[in-house]
């Protein structure tokens, strides 16, 4: 049986390599599916024989508790940027002054997320994000769900490779269409979508989102002589490598390559934002070395933002959750960086005045950071109007008078009952970094608000499944799913609630700092300015903003309402004494608990000094196992890690 399972794993992995990496499948989808189903059946019957590189690991279904930090053995450096031919020539001159015969390899700069993969004896052991270059996050379970990443190499190598994880454009469109249908906020661009997917705690979502990769570096020591040799080796090992690259000693040829790539850029199946030029010889790379931040042997040419002319037809003034009124230009449609653009930001009223932008003007539009369409300037030679841009004096949402404070560039509505601010506040409250209510995106909030089912954030917790069935697009299953997401958000640690309240100057990081110090939102609400300002040196601007917010009667009423609905107001990871019983211990929770919710168990462990992580490793000190504990328990036992049950935790 073990022999047959190994045979199936080897065959399926080879077929997957042919399909995803080589684009040359040797078997039909039906044949692959038949073998895959056979393997699934055998693994269910013989779980003790499941192999580490089995393709069934890619399916997902595992929900992670979080991501552990990962110390990179080989640091990941940034690249020096270049924006002109002159800067490339200066780089070439610097290299050739020491190594006159050096040649270069130029390759596409994929607009994705850097990842590092480490293999031990040919088996994938760790997948990690770049992080700050020295410390990233361990995302091993997620990278296993990326179809073109080999779980096992053909050779038993100890190797670390680096690459870029990206979301193909077609997949990006599919996901955003699905999110729109589900009432969820759409991703701004493929890079953001890839980043969000890599940090998903639900591996099933990762598997469903069809991420892809291109690898470009062997970080561990290699016997290869050139960068091009490294890429050939990496490709032979089964990794995806971008075929579009050149090797030359001529900067003229590299510049021609850059121009050709720039022309093709919008027609590629993935996003790129430039071309990377590296000294091809690894020996010369070693001689040139590094600065503090970047290698001296490489440079990244960044494409300039594409610019197009469009006519400014009208301006919409939109109110954000803090009352800032932002102008958005309606334009004649233009093709820009692969998409049709008919709206672009005008930033603020001061920007309009400074650039003297008028209705009817021909303007230059570009994508800031290749993401957000923005108006850059006016083509004055094509101006046909003499009238200045009309600037509103009243809020377009509630009609209240707008203010333009001396120290601000924007108009602001200060009416707390402004419908637009309330709606935007609800969207913010439900967002991922705040209460993370899955399924409550802008379109759902709009429907709830229009149906007068919610007027403030506390109203969210008074909703039930029947309320959602009143809304267009909801069926019983989707209504129950959203209701469950709302109920689950009650158990969030209170820093997410604090951030969700939308207090000016209080972001996600500040919210956590405050709750770590004060423990509960109630304690924070009653604190004086000096006490708040003293927290990690936050200062008086933030402290006064918080005090002003909680001094209002409606804020006090809101806290009471949230508490009455069972929303947690306490920080679930409070600081503990150094001599706490589990101080310094790394603990993993696994299985189903009978008496404690998982969030309660985690909070209790943290209160006793433990660091609670989502995966078992040699660094794990203790595993608390409930019923139906699976692979984590097995791994703990194989590593000789101490295992306790829920009763032990309750007795502490």
UniProtKB/Swiss-Prot annotation:
Keywords: DNA damage, DNA repair, DNA replication, Ligase, Magnesium, Manganese, Metal-binding, NAD, Zinc
Pfam families with a match to the protein in the record: BRCT, DNA_ligase_aden, DNA_ligase_OB, DNA_ligase_ZBD, HHH_2, HHH_5
One Gene Ontology term of the molecular function aspect: metal ion binding
Biological process terms in GO annotation: DNA repair; DNA replication
UniProt-listed InterPro entries: BRCT_dom, BRCT_dom_sf, DisA/LigA_HHH, DNA_ligase, DNA_ligase_AS, DNA_ligase_CS, DNAligase_adenylation, DNAligase_N
Any one GO cellular component localisation term in the record: cytosol
List of residues binding NAD(+): 29-33, 78-79, 107, 130, 164, 278, 302
Cofactor section: Mg(2+); Mn(2+)
Residues of the BRCT domain: 577-652
UniProt-listed SUPFAM superfamilies: BRCT domain, DNA ligase/mRNA capping enzyme, catalytic domain, Nucleic acid-binding proteins, RuvA domain 2-like
Catalytic activity: NAD(+) + (deoxyribonucleotide)n-3'-hydroxyl + 5'-phospho-(deoxyribonucleotide)m = (deoxyribonucleotide)n+m + AMP + beta-nicotinamide D-nucleotide
EC number: 6.5.1.2
Sequence positions that bind Zn(2+): 395, 398, 413, 418
Active site: 109
Family per similarity comment: Belongs to the NAD-dependent DNA ligase family. LigA subfamily.
Task performed by this protein: DNA ligase that catalyzes the formation of phosphodiester linkages between 5'-phosphoryl and 3'-hydroxyl groups in double-stranded DNA using NAD as a coenzyme and as the energy source for the reaction. It is essential for DNA replication and repair of damaged DNA.
Protein name: DNA ligase
Organism: Streptococcus thermophilus (strain ATCC BAA-250 / LMG 18311)
Source species taxonomy: Bacteria, Bacillati, Bacillota, Bacilli, Lactobacillales
């Amino acid at each position: 049986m073990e022999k047959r399972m190994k045979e199936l794993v080897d065959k399926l992995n080879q077929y997957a390599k042919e399909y995803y990496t080589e684009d040359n499948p040797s078997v039909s989808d039906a044949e692959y599916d038949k073998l895959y189903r056979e393997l699934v059946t055998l693994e269910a019957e013989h779980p003790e024989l499941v192999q580490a590189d089995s393709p069934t690991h890619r399916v997902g279904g595992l929900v992670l508790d979080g991501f552990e930090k990962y110390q990179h053995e080989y640091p990941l450096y940034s690249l020096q940027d270049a924006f002109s031919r002159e800067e490339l020539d200066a780089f070439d001159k610097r290299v050739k002054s020491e190594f006159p015969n050096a040649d270069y390899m130029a390759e596409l700069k994929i607009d994705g997320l850097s990842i590092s993969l480490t293999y031990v004896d040919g088996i994938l052991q760790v997948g990690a994000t770049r992080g700050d270059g020295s410390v990233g996050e361990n995302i091993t379970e997620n990278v296993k769900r990326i179809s073109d990443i080999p779980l096992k190499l053909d050779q038993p190598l100890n190797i670390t490779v680096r690459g870029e994880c990206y979301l193909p454009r077609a997949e990006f469109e599919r996901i955003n269409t699905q999110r729109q249908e589900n009432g969820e906020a759409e991703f701004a661009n493929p890079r953001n979508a890839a980043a969000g997917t890599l940090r998903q705690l639900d591996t099933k979502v990762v598997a469903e989102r069809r991420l892809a990769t291109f690898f470009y570096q062997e970080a561990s020591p290699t016997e290869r002589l050139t960068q091009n040799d490294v890429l050939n080796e990496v490709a032979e090992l089964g990794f995806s490598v971008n075929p579009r690259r050149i090797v030359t000693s001529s900067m003229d040829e590299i510049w021609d390559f850059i121009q050709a790539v720039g022309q093709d850029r919008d027609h590629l199946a993935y996003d790129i934002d430039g071309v990377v030029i590296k000294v091809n010889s690894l020996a010369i790379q070693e001689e040139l070395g590094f600065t503090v931040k970047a290698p001296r042997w490489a440079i990244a040419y960044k494409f300039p933002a594409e610019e197009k002319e469009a006519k400014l037809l009208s301006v919409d003034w939109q109110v954000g959750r803090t009352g800032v009124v932002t102008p958005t230009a309606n334009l004649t449609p233009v093709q820009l960086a692969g998409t049709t653009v008919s709206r672009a930001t005008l930033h603020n009223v001061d920007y309009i005045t400074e650039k003297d932008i008028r209705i009817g003007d021909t303007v230059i539009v570009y994508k800031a950071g290749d993401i957000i369409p923005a108006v850059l300037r006016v083509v004055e030679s094509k101006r046909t109007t003499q009238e200045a841009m009309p600037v509103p004096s009243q809020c377009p949402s509630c009609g209240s008078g707008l203010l333009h404070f001396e120290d601000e560039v924007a108009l602001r509505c200060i009416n707390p009952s402004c419908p637009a601010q309330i709606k935007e506040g609800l969207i913010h409250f439900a967002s991922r970094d705040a209460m993370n209510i899955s399924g409550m995106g802008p379109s759902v909030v709009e429907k709830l608000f229009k149906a007068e089912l919610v007027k403030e954030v506390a109203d969210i917790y008074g909703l039930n499944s029947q309320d959602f069935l009143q809304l267009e697009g909801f069926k019983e299953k989707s209504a129950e799913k959203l209701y469950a997401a709302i109920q689950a958000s009650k158990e969030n640690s209170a820093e997410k609630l604090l951030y969700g309240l939308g207090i000016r100057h209080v972001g996600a990081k500040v919210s956590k700092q405050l709750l770590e110090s004060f423990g509960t939102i109630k304690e924070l609400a009653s604190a004086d300015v000096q006490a708040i300002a003293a927290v990690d040196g936050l200062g008086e601007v933030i402290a006064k903003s918080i005090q002003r917010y909680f001094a209002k009667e409606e804020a006090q009423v809101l806290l009471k309402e949230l508490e009455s609905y069972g929303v947690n107001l306490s920080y679930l990871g409070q600081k503990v004494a150094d001599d706490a019983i589990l101080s310094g211990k790394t603990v993993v929770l696994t299985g189903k608990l009978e008496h404690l919710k998982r969030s309660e168990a985690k909070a209790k462990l943290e209160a006793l000094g433990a660091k609670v992580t989502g995966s078992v490793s040699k660094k794990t000190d203790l595993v608390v196992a409930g019923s139906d504990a699976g692979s984590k328990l097995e791994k703990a036992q194989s590593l000789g890690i101490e295992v306790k049950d829920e009763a032990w935790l309750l007795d502490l």
